[in-house]
UniProtKB/Swiss-Prot annotation:
Residues that span the membrane, as ranges: none
Species name: Schizosaccharomyces pombe (strain 972 / ATCC 24843) (Fission yeast)
GO cellular component assignments: cytoplasm
Protein name: Pumilio domain-containing protein C4G8.03c
Gene Ontology molecular function: mRNA binding
Pumilio repeats: 462-497, 498-533, 534-569, 570-606, 607-642, 643-678, 679-714, 715-752, 753-780
InterPro entries documented for this protein: ARM-like, ARM-type_fold, PUM-HD, Pumilio_RNA-bd, Pumilio_RNA-bd_rpt
Length: 780
């Protein structure tokens, strides 16, 4: 006979493997049938197991035919964990389970068919659900806390209508289960109605515990007995009820008397017969009849209790917290209007009324409009009431043409209206102050309407002492320039002393520089020299400024005598290096080189020769030297070129100096070219590999004589690593330049020298261009 323990261990291992496969919801019934087969085919049959164990196994797995079930040991309980009915009663909080994991005695299995088969895609009616609950499964304490359900389907006989599927659906729809902690509607039992059908997947998916449902319902029902101050706010309250409840709980106003409001939900199972909040009608009647305002009663009414809108001497919502005990009134404390109001309302006494505050009036804190001097809401002041009738507006006639204001009228509006006869007698301090000087721009733009003898242009003596201030104003500068154009000889003499004294400040001013340029045109010879001396005091500041460099170039164009040119060069040369390297100052030097004759520029060129390296390696300085080479000739040019050739090996490797060396080569003066190439011999290949110097080497190849070019080519081809030169991003252009200017013998020499590296460079980026040019030149 087979050992019972061995067979039991084999059977348990086999069943644990089936359980670990995580069967689908429908596969559990297959395992139930399989377990039945094992039980029937066992060699021990029913004699191998104890009656209690066999009854527990068979009744718990597939056929619970009796009204009660025997306890199941904890060691055997894991065997049935795949059963959906068992998982149904393992929910959290199920009080019906004991520590021995026994089923509740009220669970009965009542299948409509013998084996209750469930196959995929098959629907089962609610009448075929595998179990019902009897009243014994519900404790008496739970039953007492569950209200009676009135509407349910009586066609199906159940022990307790409330716990039927339809009742669960009703509870969910009514909102009674909305506040159940850690649960969702889709986690409850299926809540289909009796007439609907439920698929197998729905039935197996929607499973939970009736006991958990009962506990949560009891907790929810127990909230009805809480005090109003201890009751938590529930989201199921309607908006109007919640707002009303919050107003009553939070407000300390005597208008809101405390009411015992019962818990309100959306469910029809609970009564909503709580006491409605009733307002004190006497307060409202007194308010409407006598227009009285009780001091302690603020108008924080609910929407449905909002009193009728009546005229009020104040707006409570606009009061500050510290002023809430007093009333705002637009009337004065000692006015008759307040006395009349105080007779109707004793609250409106002088001690209870704040005095009229301009700040509050501007904020419109009263009910009546406060800004009575505006036409509309854009605060366009026209002296009319804001709600004036459009029909009563005065019709405007045709607009009168505006008369042009004269300059004299504008000046008189600034200095005061005086006649030309007595204008000079008025002290200047009385005519011009600091505040008026600041507002000069606005006053000069004013337009007059009448012409009179008093509106003539005053004598310029009235402006003396303040010309520099007027020149810095846009309209003042234009006005003074116009005066200069009208009477240049007299007015220039009057303006010059003050302009000369502030010439440095005016030359860099956005508006004053135009006055300096205009005055230099009408100034005499002595005045021009004096102005140049004044400019020399701040030549660097003037030439480095955006406005100063423009005014300085304009003055250079107006220099006519050698004396003026010599004086200007004498002023510029000490600051030559600073001005030549400046973005704005370089334009002043270029203007001098282009405007003055070369013989007058000799001091300037000699100064550049002394600072050649500094200027040649600067972005703006190299441009100045190139302009000098173009303007000079003879000895001056030779001196500059000698200085450049002397340092050409250093300059050719500089980002800006190489342009100066190329400019000397572009002069196409053969002695200069040969001297430069002689400086490069021995470094042709190294210079060809560099970015800046390779451009100068190409320029040497173009301008060199044939004999000199052949010497350069031999040095280039004799480089040990010729492949590096041919494939270099800069040196390959030097080789292409050799091929462009080489004759037949030189091309043959190039082909013979690079033939051994052609297979290596024919597929490179730069080597392909060299071979293509070499092939085209040899074939032609």
């Amino acid at each position: 006979m087979v050992n019972r323990d061995a067979y039991n261990e084999l059977n348990l291992n086999k069943k644990s493997q089936e359980t670990n496969r995580k069967p689908s919801p429908l596969s559990s019934y297959t395992s139930i049938s399989r377990e039945l087969d094992y039980a029937n085919q066992s060699p021990f049959s029913s004699n191998s197991f104890s009656p209690t164990e066999l009854k527990a196994r068979t009744s718990a797995t597939f056929d619970v035919r009796s009204a009660s079930t025997s306890p199941i040991n904890a060691s055997d309980f894991h065997k049935y964990s795949h059963d959906p009915f068992q998982r149904l009663f393992k929910a959290k909080g199920n009080a019906s389970f004991s520590k021995t994991k026994s089923f509740p005695s009220s669970v009965t299995y009542s299948p409509s068919e013998e084996t209750f088969p469930l196959t995929s895609g098959m629907n089962k009616s609610v009448h075929e659900y595998p179990f019902t609950l009897s009243e014994s499964a519900i404790s008496s304490s739970h039953k007492s806390s569950i209200p009676e359900r009135r509407n349910f389907d009586s066609s199906v006989s159940v022990s307790n209508p409330l716990l039927h599927w339809n009742n669960v659906d009703t509870l969910l729809r009514d909102g009674s289960l909305e506040n159940v902690n850690n649960s969702r509607q889709d986690q409850f039992l299926p809540y289909k109605t009796f007439s609907s059908t439920i698929s197998n997947s729905d039935f197996l998916h929607r499973e939970s515990s009736f006991s958990s449902l009962i506990d949560e319902e009891s907790k929810l029902a127990s909230l009805r007995n809480l005090n109003i101050n201890d009751r938590p706010p529930l989201p199921v309250l309607k908006n109007s009820e919640r707002n009303l409840l919050h107003r009553q709980l939070l407000s300390n106003h005597p208008f809101f008397s405390q009411n015992n409001v019962s818990l309100s939900t959306n469910s029809k199972n609970y009564s909503t017969d709580f006491t409605k909040i009733q307002s004190d009608s006497s307060l409202l009647q007194n308010r409407q009849q006598n227009h009285r305002i009780e001091t302690d009663q603020l108008s924080h009414f609910p929407d449905h209790l909002d009193p009728s809108r009546i005229p009020s001497p104040y707006q409570p919502s606009s009061l500050q917290p510290l002023e809430s005990r007093k009333l705002h009134s637009k009337v004065d404390v000692h006015s008759k209007k307040l006395n009349a109001l105080s007779q109707l309302n004793p609250i409106l006494r002088s001690e209870n009324v704040l005095q009229n505050d301009n700040h509050h009036s501007s904020l419109s804190m009263d009910n009546d409009p406060t800004n009575v001097s505006t036409k509309n809401r854009n605060n366009q002041t026209v002296g009319e009431h804001p709600y004036v009738d459009d029909n009563k507006k005065k019709k405007k006639g045709p607009a009168k043409p505006k008369e042009k204001a004269t300059l004299g009228k504008t000046v008189n509006s600034f200095f005061g209206s005086h006649s030309t006869s007595n204008y000079s007698k008025v002290p200047l301090s009385a005519k011009l102050t600091g505040e008026k000087s600041d507002d000069l721009s606005n006053l000069l733009k004013n337009k007059g309407k009448k012409k009179s003898q008093d509106n003539q242009i005053p004598h310029l003596v009235g402006f003396l002492g303040h010309l520099s201030t007027i020149c810095k104003d846009q309209y003042g500068c234009r006005y003074l320039q116009k005066l200069l154009d009208e009477n240049p000889k007299v007015n220039a003499s009057l303006f010059f002393p003050e302009i000369r004294q502030s010439v440095v400040q005016l030359m860099i001013d956005p508006f004053g520089n135009y006055m300096c340029q205009k005055l230099f045109v009408y100034a005499s010879r002595e005045q021009k020299l004096s102005m140049l001396n004044g400019i020399g005091e701040g030549i660097v500041d003037i030439c480095s400024n955006l406005y100063g460099t423009r005014s300085m170039q304009n003055i250079i164009d107006k220099l006519t005598s050698n004396e003026q040119i010599s004086l200007l060069l004498k002023i510029i040369i000490p600051s030559l290096t600073t001005l030549a390297c400046d973005n704005n100052g370089t334009h002043v030097l270029q203007k001098c080189i282009a405007k003055f004759p070369p013989e007058k520029l000799e001091p300037l060129f000699l100064s550049m020769e002394e600072n050649l390296i500094t200027l040649a390696t600067n972005r703006h300085g190299c441009c100045i030297l190139q302009r000098c080479l173009d303007r000079t000739n003879g000895d001056i040019q030779e001196r500059l070129v000698n200085s450049i050739i002397k340092s050409c090996l250093l300059l050719v490797q500089n980002a800006y100096g190489n342009y100066l060396v190329q400019h000397v080569l572009e002069l196409n003066i053969q002695p200069y070219t040969e001297r430069i190439i002689e400086k490069f011999f021995g470094n042709i290949c190294k210079l060809s590999l560099q970015k800046f110097s390779s451009n100068a080497i190409e320029q040497c190849i173009r301008t060199a004589s044939p004999s000199t070019r052949e010497q350069m080519l031999q040095e280039f081809l004799s480089f040990p690593n010729i492949e590096q030169l041919l494939d270099d991003c800069y040196a390959n252009y030097v080789m292409q330049r050799f091929l462009n200017v080489a004759d037949e013998s030189q091309k043959f020499l190039i082909l013979r020298s690079i033939s051994h590296v052609i297979p290596k460079i024919q597929n490179t980026r730069h080597g392909r261009h060299i071979l293509a040019k070499l092939t085209s030149s040899t074939s032609s």
